[in-house]
Amino acid sequence: MTGVQTCALPIFDVTLTSDHRQALEANGLVVPGVGAFGACMEGLKSVGGDTVIKDRLRAGRPVLGVCVGEQIMFERGMEHGTGTPGLGLIKGDVELLDADVVPHMGWDTVEAPEGSVLMKGVEGERFYFVHSFAAMSAAPADTSGDQLDFDDAEERVTWCTYGRSRFVAAYERGPLFATQFHPEKSAEAGSQLLRNWIATF
């Protein structure tokens, strides 16, 4: 929260909440996550967070998932050899990194696409990662069943390579934003990324 607060204040108040009304009405919603995919999904559902996220996206209100908060936006997490359903907002599975040393921990460069909102001005910078799992592919999911209004929005994917894995480092589509890295731990580049996101409000 500290990194988000630093970038948002004094323009915005930052509140840690599981209150539905506050989460729905906020200018932007950050969905953090640490630990296991399954535990994160279980905790999110226990407070109705899955519904809040989809309700916000349905209304075109920005959501930013960070680390496991990014991973749960995908269809499945493949930890422990089993597939745990995610929110299904991005097509793809979250899998164990193929590398000699796991977790991937530390600073790394990324490959940003043209026109990225999040990466504007920080395309050549390094970001801080701490993770063992990641999405190896990304494609727009069919969200028509959830009646989301951004099926025609352009998808922009930022990539990172670690070991033998090329994985999704950041994702943008309409009001949905997500990063596998931690912007709040990524010094000035991370602060600028958060400011870029805040500018979409």
Q: What is each stretch, according to the model?
A:
Residues 1, 22-23, 56:
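Structural alpha-helical scaffold elements that stabilize or flank donor/cofactor-binding regions
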Residues 2-9:
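Short, small-residue-biased leader/transition segments that mark boundaries at the very start
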Residues 30-32:
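Structural motif
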Residues 35-106:
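Cysteine-nucleophile active-site neighborhood
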Residues 58, 92-201:
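Amide-donor transfer/coupling interface in amidating biosynthetic enzymes
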